[in-house]
């Protein structure tokens, strides 16, 4: 399975990981200096869940993001699936 949420469209993002040295000014130091920068990826918080669909009258096994799970609690599974289909996820 991919790392993309089928209900919200969340997918991995790219960013940087910074290596720093020095003592922070807050701690009476001269300040922090960046000594290196490495590419990294930020992954969405994915969860595999079995959810009951009342329309299809069966369980659906979905790998969804944690924010999609909160959205399902708030709106209901059928509304979230309809919304995802209309947005093209």
From Swiss-Prot:
Coiled-coil parts of chain: none
Alphabetical list of SUPFAM superfamilies matching this protein: L28p-like
A single BP term in Gene Ontology: translation
Gene Ontology cellular component annotations, sorted alphabetically: ribonucleoprotein complex; ribosome
InterPro entries: Ribosomal_bL28 (IPR026569), Ribosomal_bL28/bL31-like_sf (IPR034704), Ribosomal_bL28_bact-type (IPR001383), Ribosomal_bL28_sf (IPR037147)
Keyword Membrane among UniProt keywords: no
GO molecular function per UniProt: structural constituent of ribosome
Keywords of this entry: Ribonucleoprotein, Ribosomal protein
Domain of life: Bacteria
Family: Belongs to the bacterial ribosomal protein bL28 family.
PANTHER family: 39S RIBOSOMAL PROTEIN L28, MITOCHONDRIAL, LARGE RIBOSOMAL SUBUNIT PROTEIN BL28M
Protein name: Large ribosomal subunit protein bL28
Source organism of the structure: Chlamydia felis (strain Fe/C-56) (Chlamydophila felis)
Taxonomic lineage from the root: Bacteria, Pseudomonadati, Chlamydiota, Chlamydiia, Chlamydiales
Gene: rpmB
């Amino acid at each position: 399975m991919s790392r993309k949420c089928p209900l919200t469209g969340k997918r991995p993002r790219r960013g940087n990981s910074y290596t720093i040295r020095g003592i922070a000014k807050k701690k009476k130091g001269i300040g922090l200096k960046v000594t290196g920068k490495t590419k990294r990826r930020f992954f969405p918080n994915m969860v595999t869940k079995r959810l009951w669909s009342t329309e299809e009258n069966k369980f659906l096994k979905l790998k969804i993001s944690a924010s999609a799970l909160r959205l399902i609690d708030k709106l209901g599974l059928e509304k979230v699936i309809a919304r995802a289909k209309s947005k093209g996820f």
